[in-house]
Design a protein with these regions (language model features):
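An N-terminal, well-structured beta->alpha segment
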Residues: 5-112, 204-229, 240
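Gly/Ser/Thr-enriched, mixed-charge loops and adjacent short helices
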Residues: 13, 17-21, 42-51, 160-285, ...
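Conserved phosphate/anionic-ligand binding catalytic regions in large, soluble enzymes, centered on
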Residues: 47-67, 152-155, 236-248, 304, ...
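N-terminal small/polar loop signature for handling phosphorylated ligands or for N-terminal nucleophile
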Residues: 91, 96-159, 248, 253-311
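Short Gly/Thr/Asp-enriched flexible loops that form oxyanion-binding sites at enzyme active sites
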Residues: 108-116, 159-166, 245, 307-330, ...
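Glycine-rich phosphate-binding loop plus the immediately following alpha-helix
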Residues: 165-194, 328-347, 351-361
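Phosphate-binding and adjacent anionic-ligand microenvironments
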Residues: 292, 296-298, 319-323, 341-517, ...
Length: 563
């Protein structure tokens, strides 16, 4: 766009924007009313591109313009979603709309509900901030044709998002994303989009009933009621998980968790953490300090919308006496625990291409079905839905996402926390810890060391620069990973094994590197794995050290190669 075109686009946006806050933002960028120079750089960032609606819905920084999350973008997106639902035979069927506790989430949810109701869809609108798993559960429980959750999960405070579920309770996958995106593009002037008033009878509050039903379903999944002697420290990281998680744990027979007071209440500014992501360094510092103070047995943490679970365990060998598990460690030990509670070869466990290969080995040893999918829980849920002849037991991704059973067809940090608490209590009753069980698995299946690095690409050209980096890796891959010759290069954009995706996989004997763009943030992710066989339990420490060194070298070389 030329500067003149940018100014014209910004003025047109301002004139139809229903939000005085973002209207004022645009006016400031255009310059004083009596004259002045427009801020072209800021206008390019807001109006030179637009947020792309994809399988993750929408997610981005809040502000004015089509490349930001704002009321106008939400109204257009919802009008497109309503048109898609009507065109696919769901006219007049109910939709559930929820939201987290971020800035503007309640306003965006109200706008979405108003558009859907005016389009003829009865709306179940949350009357309070809710965990994302509760809203995903509500799609099926309430008999809806779709669900919308306004959330940016663990993104920085400046961000928000718009997540869409279809009637099976799973996130959208292609081609639904492109079909909805096309409907959004076809939306006319904002004034042409009808919006029902908040008191419209087609909009009803979810009230307590939805949360009550979710809690009952979660508690019904619990087993091993004789093992409940556990002191748990919990943090919702300033998010919305506390009340529901506490009800689930207490309902299953555990004592109420000891909650980190400074992070107990929802706060959209996340003041005690640099990023509200339990994977980030420092995010669990307050939890671990409290755990040492109260002599806890387990630390569990949710991200702000409670769809992810982080875990830490007492470990005398770790710095500070506590060790935070990786997403792969949480996933593999939960899978082993859940498989041990049942029988049958018709059971299914699922993970993603960037997660550890250890789950595949575990499934083979336990004689159960295994599926591997593209990154993202939308694909894990589909793997279960596409195999109705199998009983889905568990799915996980390395980014702290887990799905226990079929209550929720998305990642759920609350039911995962319950399952992990049961596992920890059961091991404690036997005089062991979860770390002992992880040692058992490493001895049986080999040490699977994993790690990742992220490279951020800021600015309006960030996506283009990320794609160029992936292109370069596929065209000229390294000949070795940490000294191990590369035996295979898989360009997953070709879709030969799974649906096409922006990723390149390099494999060698016992080593692997995957490079892919993030689906929700402007960054390139590099995932490494090194598998080290173990002959005896006494070899574990050396094998783990060797695996960590291999992974670090692979990642160092990968970052150097794409920057």
């Amino acid at each position: 766009m030329t500067p003149e075109e940018l100014v014209h686009a910004a003025r047109a946006w301002r004139d139809e924007d229903p939000d005085p806050e973002t209207r004022s933002e645009v006016e400031g960028l255009l310059g004083p009313a009596g004259g002045g120079t427009p801020d072209v750089v800021a206008l390019v960032d807001r109006f030179g591109a637009r947020l792309q609606f994809g399988t993750a819905g929408l997610r981005g920084e809040m502000g004015a313009g089509p490349n930001r999350m704002n009321r106008a973008v939400v109204i257009r997106a919802t009008a497109g979603l309503a048109a898609h639902l009507a065109a696919t035979g769901h006219a007049g069927q109910p939709v559930v709309v929820g939201y987290d506790a971020r800035h503007r989430s309640d306003r965006f949810a109200a706008d979405a509900a108003g558009v859907l109701a005016a389009a003829g869809f009865p709306v179940h609108l949350a009357d309070r901030p809710l965990p994302t798993p509760v809203v995903a559960f509500g799609v099926v429980h309430l008999g809806c044709c779709a669900g919308v959750q306004v959330t940016a999960s663990h993104n920085p405070p400046r961000d928000n998002g718009y997540k869409v579920y279809l009637g099976d309770g799973a996130q959208i996958v292609p081609p639904s994303d492109t079909e909805i995106s096309a409907r959004i593009d076809a939306v006319g002037p904002l004034a042409s989009v009808p919006r029902a008033a908040p008191d419209d009878p087609r909009i009803t509050a979810t009230g307590d009933a939805l949360v009550d039903a979710y809690v009952a379903g979660a508690v019904a999944q619990a087993t091993a009621p004789d093992a409940r002697d556990l002191r748990i420290v919990y943090t919702p990281l300033h998010g919305v998980g506390r009340d529901v998680l506490t009800r689930v744990l207490v309902g299953a027979g555990f004592a109420p968790p000891v909650v980190v007071d400074e992070q107990a209440d929802p706060d959209p500014d996340f003041p005690t953490v640099a990023f509200p992501n339990p994977e980030e360094p420092g995010a669990l510092d307050l939890s671990l300090a409290l755990a040492r103070e109260v002599d806890a047995d387990l630390v569990v943490a949710n991200d702000p919308d409670a769809d992810r679970l982080a875990v830490a365990l007492p470990d005398p060998a770790a710095e500070g006496g506590w060790r935070a598990l990786t997403g792969d460690e949480i996933g593999i030990v939960l899978a082993d625990w859940l498989l041990a509670r049942g029988r049958g070869s018709d059971r299914l466990v699922v993970t993603t291409i960037v997660s550890s290969s250890m789950l595949a080995r575990l499934a083979a040893r336990r004689g159960v079905a295994y599926a591997e999918t593209l990154t993202g829980f939308k694909w894990l849920a589909r793997a279960a839905l596409d195999r109705p002849e199998l009983r889905f037991v568990f799915g996980y991704e390395e980014a702290l996402g887990s799905c226990v059973g079929t209550l929720v067809r998305d990642k759920d940090g609350i039911t995962a926390a319950l399952a992990f608490a049961e596992l920890a209590a059961s091991e404690r009753r036997r005089g062991r810890s979860v770390l002992d069980r992880l040692d058992d698995l490493a001895t049986e299946l080999g040490v699977h060391a994993t790690g990742q690095r992220s490279i951020r690409f800021e600015g309006v050209d960030g996506l283009a620069r990320m794609r160029a980096a992936v292109d370069g890796l596929a065209a000229a891959p390294p000949v070795a990973l940490a000294g191990v010759p590369v035996a295979e290069v898989e360009d997953m954009r070709l879709g030969t094994r799974l649906p096409p995706t922006d990723a390149v996989v390099l494999r060698g004997e016992g080593v692997r590197l995957i490079v892919r763009p993030s689906g929700t943030e402007p960054k390139l992710k590099c995932y490494a794995e090194a598998v080290v066989p173990v002959g005896a339990r006494a070899e574990l420490a050396a094998a783990r050290e060797h695996g960590r060194a291999l992974v670090a070298t692979i990642l160092d070389d990968a970052v150097a190669g794409v920057t």
